[in-house]
Amino acid sequence: MTTTPIHPTRPQTNSNRVIPTSTQGSTLADILERVLDKGIVIAGDISISIASTELIHIRIRLLISSVDKAREMGINWWENDPYLSSKSQRLVEENQQLQQRLESLETQLRLLTSAAKEETTLTANNPEDLQPMYEVNSQEGDNSQLEA
């Protein structure tokens, strides 16, 4: 009769068991998804003072969330910021058009101003042109009386 030798077995200890944690089986993507879904706020104050005289006090508030969660909370400043939205190109083009219109209007104004100055200079050189209209009309009326 053959017998198989019996080997002593090791008693099981707690070192073989895995301690469950809240991040067990979670990848970085899972953690980010949870944080962005719920949102997280980090707040802090920085104060610099010398001899109980406060020089600088900075309050920092940081909100990390998904775009959808931020919209739910009423935060959507990036939608109206021309540097962060697709409207920026349209605003640049509109700005260029307005600059061109402004330059055109300034050129027209300069031309009109110089023309008005020239006209004033010409009329100042010819005093006959400065006679009031009623004097011219009264002289014409005098001639008609002489003819009759």
Swiss-Prot record:
Annotated Gene Ontology cellular component terms: gas vesicle; vesicle membrane
Record field: compositional bias (Polar residues): 136-148
Name of the protein in its database record: Gas vesicle protein J
Keyword Amino-acid biosynthesis applies: no
Intracellular or extracellular location(s): Gas vesicle
Family: Belongs to the gas vesicle GvpA family.
MF-aspect GO terms: structural molecule activity
Name of the gene encoding the protein in the UniProt record: gvpJ
PROSITE patterns found in the cross-reference section: GAS_VESICLE_A_1 (PS00234)
KW Chaperone (keyword) present: no
Subunit and partners: Interacts with GvpA.
Keywords of this entry: Gas vesicle
Pfam families: Gas_vesicle
Function per UniProt: A minor component of the gas vesicle, might be involved in nucleating gas vesicle formation. Gas vesicles (GV) are hollow, gas filled proteinaceous nanostructures. During planktonic growth they allow positioning of the organism at a favorable depth for light or nutrient acquisition.
Lineage top rank: taxon: Bacteria
Disordered: region residues: 1-21, 118-148
Chief site of localization: other
